[in-house]
């Protein structure tokens, strides 16, 4: 397996190696964002659920580390809670832009590598070695870049949707908590 990879790299052009390296970085970044955001959002959802439960049980204050805990110090206003919700939304959705960029550009980056490799193959055809035994392997190797681009784009798009759903879930819990806080403190507002 390792020999096949080394053989492929030794026959590849600079552009193909550059494209595959770029896609490898994208692939690693995709999984890094997934793992970090899923751990972060899952623990955040747990904390916000606990805070919401506490509020629903009649507590006027949030004793659990919640994003709204900072917002209920001093005067409680709807505007102040809305600002906290907006800040939470920004934190919850960070990383989604990168996943979107990776999902949308990876196939094009792979296609670019394929086109350059096929152009190189056609340029070599003019040298006289234009047999099918020479052209077919070169074109099949060129298509590896397109396959790699699609291989990177699919998980990036999938992870984008998964994280977007988790972010929606945490923001929804925070909004419900803000509603309960406003209701519990309506006499102060």
Residue spans of the language-model regions?
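Predominantly long cytosolic amphipathic alpha-helical stalk/bundle segments
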Residues: 33, 39-131, 158-189
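Hydrophobic alpha-helical transmembrane segments of polytopic membrane proteins
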Residues: 144-158
């Amino acid at each position: 397996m390792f020999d096949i990879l080394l053989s492929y790299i030794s026959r590849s052009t600079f552009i193909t190696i550059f494209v595959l390296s770029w896609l490898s970085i994208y692939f690693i970044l995709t999984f890094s964002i997934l793992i970090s955001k899923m751990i972060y959002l899952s623990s955040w959802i747990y904390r916000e659920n606990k805070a919401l439960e506490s509020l629903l049980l009649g507590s006027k204050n949030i004793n659990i580390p919640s994003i709204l805990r900072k917002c209920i110090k001093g005067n409680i206003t709807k505007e102040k809670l809305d600002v906290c919700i907006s800040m939470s939304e920004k934190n919850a959705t960070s990383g989604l832009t990168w996943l979107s960029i990776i999902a949308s550009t990876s196939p094009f980056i792979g296609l670019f590598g394929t086109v350059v490799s096929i152009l190189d193959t056609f340029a070599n055809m003019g040298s006289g070695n234009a047999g099918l035994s020479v052209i077919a392997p070169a074109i099949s190797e060129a298509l590896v870049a397109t396959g790699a681009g699609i291989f990177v784009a699919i998980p990036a798009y999938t992870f984008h949707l998964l994280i977007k759903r988790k972010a929606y879930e945490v923001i929804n819990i925070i909004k419900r908590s803000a509603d309960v806080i406003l209701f519990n403190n309506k006499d102060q507002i």
